[in-house]
């Protein structure tokens, strides 16, 4: 019985990763999806290291997020829209509202730059507040520009 429960739990934990994997994506779409996965991992690392007050990891992760913010626009050329075969979650609004998308990226870029600066002061409350701004910029963009 224990083995059966373990297998079921393992299946339900890993199944979402298979269903949303980028194995069908190629080229710029695959690269974009990998960059977003890396960004997600960096956000998790920052969140974890806030509780440990590990400002070096927080700053390094914020620097990587800021680098991604500055190059993100290059990963959304025309023709890289979402389709049923590439598993991209990019909304058509990215291409129909390019100014809005640029503004959302700029918000992320500014928030991540602020996090770099604030985390260097090693004040946990200010750093946590700045991290929430970065997270809000991600959420805001995803709500508007992700399917």
Please name every model-derived segment.
Residues 26-57, 63-147:
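Sequence context surrounding c-type heme c attachment/ligation sites in exported
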Residues 20-23:
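Boundary of Sec targeting at the N-terminus
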Residues 1-7:
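Bacterial N-terminal signal peptides that target proteins for export
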Residues 14-18:
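N-terminal signal peptide c-region/cleavage motif recognized by signal peptidases
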């Amino acid at each position: 019985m224990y083995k059966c429960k373990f297998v079921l739990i393992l299946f339900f934990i890993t199944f979402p990763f298979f269903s949303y994997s980028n194995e069908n994506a190629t080229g710029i779409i695959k690269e974009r999806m990998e960059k977003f996965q890396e960004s997600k991992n960096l956000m998790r690392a920052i969140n974890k290291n806030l509780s440990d007050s590990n400002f070096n990891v927080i700053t390094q992760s914020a620097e990587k997020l800021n680098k991604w913010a500055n190059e993100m626009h290059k990963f959304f050329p025309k023709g890289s829209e979402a389709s049923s075969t590439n598993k991209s979650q990019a909304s058509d609004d990215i291409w129909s509202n390019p100014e809005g998308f640029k503004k959302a990226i700029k918000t992320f870029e500014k928030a991540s730059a602020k996090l770099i600066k604030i985390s260097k002061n090693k004040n946990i409350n200010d750093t946590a507040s700045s991290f929430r701004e970065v997270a809000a910029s991600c959420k805001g963009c995803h709500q508007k520009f992700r399917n």
